[in-house]
């Protein structure tokens, strides 16, 4: 039996040295140390040995089992290290290769439209001016010919913060602030982009939206200057085929006042569902600066005239891009926003 144990030891050594994979090592472990393995069979036959032989054979069998287990562990560790090195060589990264580009973003449609508006008026010699979003009652209403008892205050739902402090309902207060700083200097040609706040929230209104106010003040400015300016703006923004229409309207801070319509961007003025079959779409309000506003701001209304206009950036964007729900502009849905990537 000692001879058989020695044979098992040599066979196991040769098998372990020739093993090239972890699967082969597992087969060797089962073949020699498993429940039906070669060494197990020898140990089970020890019952037939005499009392004198049993300790000697048992000791030899245990030594061989320990040897096989140690060799298995060593060979397993060596093969695992070899597999790891092979994987590392296969996964080698060339750090000199260019990296994968990150997905690029794009400008929001409101940003695109606002930049286009600014480009047009900067080309006409206007300057960009900004003002506070938290405004006083005086600049938001009273200085714009809207005294406290004026019924036109009901035209706007205002967010009051407390006392005379409120969130501005339009960018028009910056007109007065700029004229106060400039008077009696001439000319004044500014546009005022910014956020405004009103208590509205539906498919065509938002409690926070963007406006661009325009103001031109000088000697001998007429309504024809206003009309020519807005005609040019409409053609630049919506295309050279765009026609404009001025309708009489009312704004407390301009006199005379007019709403400005453009020929429908969907049907070209023929009449469709978007323009309610009229062929026209409203884009902004405008008018000649009211003499009282000029006087309050430090100008002599007998010598100086001016015009003003105000447009909602969301309104322009919806018409330019065919957007039918203003809320899409504020929901940050990437499926919507990705359509505007250049």
From Swiss-Prot:
> Can the keyword Manganese be found in this entry's annotation?
no
Matching entries from Gene3D superfamilies are given as: Bira Bifunctional Protein, Domain 2
Broad enzyme group = ligase
Which reactions is this enzyme annotated as catalysing?
tRNA(Phe) + L-phenylalanine + ATP = L-phenylalanyl-tRNA(Phe) + AMP + diphosphate + H(+)
Cofactor(s) needed for function: Mg(2+)
E.C. number(s) listed in UniProt? 6.1.1.20
Q: Cofactor: bound how, per the entry note?
A: Binds 2 magnesium ions per tetramer.
Keywords for this protein: Aminoacyl-tRNA synthetase, ATP-binding, Cytoplasm, Ligase, Magnesium, Metal-binding, Nucleotide-binding, Protein biosynthesis
Binding-site list for Mg(2+): 255
Look up keyword Transmembrane and say if it applies.
no
| Main subcellular localisation | cytoplasm
- Which superkingdom is the protein from? Bacteria
Give the matching Pfam families.
Phe_tRNA-synt_N, tRNA-synt_2d
Q: Which GO terms describe its cellular component?
A: cytoplasm
Record's subcellular location = Cytoplasm
Any one GO molecular function term: transferase activity
Leader peptide range in chain numbering: none
GO biological-process terms attached to the record: phenylalanyl-tRNA aminoacylation
Q: Which NCBIfam families does this chain map to? A: pheS
Q: Which family does it belong to?
A: Belongs to the class-II aminoacyl-tRNA synthetase family. Phe-tRNA synthetase alpha subunit type 1 subfamily.
Listed under subunit, the entry gives: Tetramer of two alpha and two beta subunits.
- What this protein is called in its record is Phenylalanine--tRNA ligase alpha subunit
From which organism does this entry originate? Pelotomaculum thermopropionicum (strain DSM 13744 / JCM 10971 / SI)
Q: Which gene encodes it?
A: pheS
